[in-house]
Each structure stands twice: as C-alpha cells, then as structure tokens.
C-alpha cells in the first residue's frame, strides 16, 4: 500500500513537471518568455479560457514561422508585445491561463500542451 502511494506521488510530480513551467518576471514589465518546448520543436502560444481539458484556446500570434505577429484582442489589452521570441507584458493573463503548444511537426497534428505560470517579483 505504501509503495502504491509513493508511486502515485512520484507519477503526479513527474506529470506536473512535464505539463507546467514556472517562470519569474517583474510585474507590468516586458518579459521574454522562456520556451519550455524541446529543441527543434515548434511552439504556438495561447490563452486557455476555462479550466476543462476541452476549454477554448485563443491564439496569441499569427503568420508563418519567421514572420509571426501578435494578434491583439480587446479583452487582453496589449498583453502580447512580439512573437519571435514571445514577449509579453508581465501580468497574469486577463482570463484563463497561458499555454504553449509544442509539436515536432509544423502542422501540430501530434502535440502536447504546457501551462506557463508566471511568478511576479
């Protein structure tokens, strides 16, 4: 029984580590986010609205890689400054959470999502 509990805790820590990135930034200052995707992977940034796995994802950048530009939404204000690399105003997302989608393929057919949590200093 104890072994099962220990295994469950280890699995939880491992899963949390792989699906979440915690980064520190100065509040209301421009901040270049460290991309948690592995090297040679494509990354696409979103705001996830809602807590469910099937929650709506709102894309932060558009265009082809090498020429991506921010999409400005009225509800987010000027949250996104630039896209390559992603630079934001260091603040909690106005709604939802910040998500990066990582994929080895350009078309993102197979991907995994990583939640980025900002710790304000």
Curated annotation (Swiss-Prot):
Domain of life: Viruses
CDD domains per record: ORF8-Ig_bat_SARS-CoV_HKU3-1_type-III-like (cd21643)
Keyword Transcription: no
Residues covered by the SARS ORF8 Ig-like domain: 19-121
InterPro entries recorded: ORF8_bat_SARS-CoV_HKU3-1-like, ORF8_betacoronavirus, SARS_ORF8_IG
Keywords: Disulfide bond, Signal
Disulfide bonds: 25-90, 37-102, 61-83
Record has Ubl conjugation as a keyword: no
Signal peptide residue numbers: 1-15
Note: This protein corresponds nearly to the fused 8a and 8b proteins of SARS-CoV.
Protein name stated in the entry: Non-structural protein 8
Lineage: Viruses, Riboviria, Orthornavirae, Pisuviricota, Pisoniviricetes
């Amino acid at each position: 029984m104890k072994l099962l509990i220990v295994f469950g805790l280890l699995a939880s820590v491992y899963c949390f580590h792989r699906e979440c990135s915690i980064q520190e930034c100065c509040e209301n200052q421009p901040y270049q986010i460290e991309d948690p995707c592995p090297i040679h992977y494509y990354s696409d940034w979103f705001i996830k609205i809602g807590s469910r796995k099937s929650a709506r994802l709102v894309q932060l950048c558009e265009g082809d890689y090498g020429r991506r530009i921010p999409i400005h939404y009225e509800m987010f204000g000027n949250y996104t400054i630039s896209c390559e690399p992603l630079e934001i105003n260091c603040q909690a997302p106005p709604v939802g959470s910040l998500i990066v989608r990582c994929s080895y393929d350009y078309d993102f057919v197979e991907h995994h999502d990583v939640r980025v949590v900002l710790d304000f200093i």
